[in-house]
């Protein structure tokens, strides 16, 4: 949780080097694109740059991924030498000739077998993982505690699997009109889609 005006980190529950190193060692053998979020900034192994060009996500998202990350020659060395913790990893995949996403299922099975992390999809068939006890719902409750707000007085809006925890934690959970069926099923309300000003929509 960051204070936007100052950039100050108010709360963090990140993966330490001991947890993330064996996972990264495996991921670095796969033909995927990965981002590590450390201290609120995104870092990408240099070998993933070419893979980023092959992603089939919308061009705006691809451009964001390519232009906003710091590229690292050796991400493991960077983490070790600076004694850093990783807040979240985001993985993106590109399709083979038959349309299947290369290495996605292999990576998914590897990640979900690790009880120390939580793995979800954040959209466009990506995979994201954090510590098992770190998710948006935990973050919302911690923010409410910091602000002195009753969690029942909060509202959260989301559309994909990585929003389920925060929708369930909020006093009022709202699903976007373009949300997955699972998100809509857990929400208290469903608004319009993200192309129709859904957040500002009034029921």
Describe each model-derived feature in a short phrase.
Residues 1-24, 31, 40:
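Alpha-helical substrate-recognition element adjacent to the catalytic core
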Residues 5-7, 47-50, 132, 165, ...:
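Short secondary-structure transition/capping segments
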Residues 12, 129-132, 192:
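Glycine- and other small-residue-rich loops at beta-strand/loop junctions that grip anionic moieties
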Residues 18, 135, 194:
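Conserved active-site and cofactor/substrate-binding residues in soluble primary-metabolism enzymes
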Residues 22, 26, 30-32, 37-157:
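Conserved acidic, metal-coordinating active-site core of Asp-based
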Residues 140, 153-187, 192:
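Acidic, Mg2+-coordinating phosphoryl-transfer loop and its flanking beta/alpha structural elements
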Residues 202-203:
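Conserved small/polar residues in nucleotide/adenosyl-binding loops
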């Amino acid at each position: 949780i960051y204070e936007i005006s100052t950039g100050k980190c108010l709360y963090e529950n990140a993966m330490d080097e001991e947890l993330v190193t064996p996972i990264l060692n495996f991921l670095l053998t796969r033909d995927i694109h990965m981002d590590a979020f450390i201290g609120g900034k995104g870092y990408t192994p240099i070998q993933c740059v070419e893979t980023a060009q092959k992603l089939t996500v919308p061009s705006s998202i691809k451009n964001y991924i390519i232009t906003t990350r710091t590229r690292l020659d050796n991400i493991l060395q960077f983490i070790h030498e600076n004694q850093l913790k990783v807040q979240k990893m985001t993985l993106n995949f590109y399709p083979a000739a038959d349309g299947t996403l290369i290495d996605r299922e292999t990576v998914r099975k590897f990640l979900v077998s690790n009880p120390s992390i939580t793995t979800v999809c954040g959209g466009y068939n990506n995979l994201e993982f954090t510590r098992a006890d770190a998710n948006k719902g935990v973050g919302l409750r911690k923010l409410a505690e910091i602000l002195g707000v009753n969690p029942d007085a909060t509202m959260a809006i989301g559309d994909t699997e990585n929003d389920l925890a925060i929708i369930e934690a909020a006093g009022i959970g709202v699903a976007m009109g373009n949300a997955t069926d699972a998100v809509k099923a857990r929400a208290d309300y469903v608004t319009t889609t993200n192309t129709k000003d859904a957040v500002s929509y009034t029921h």
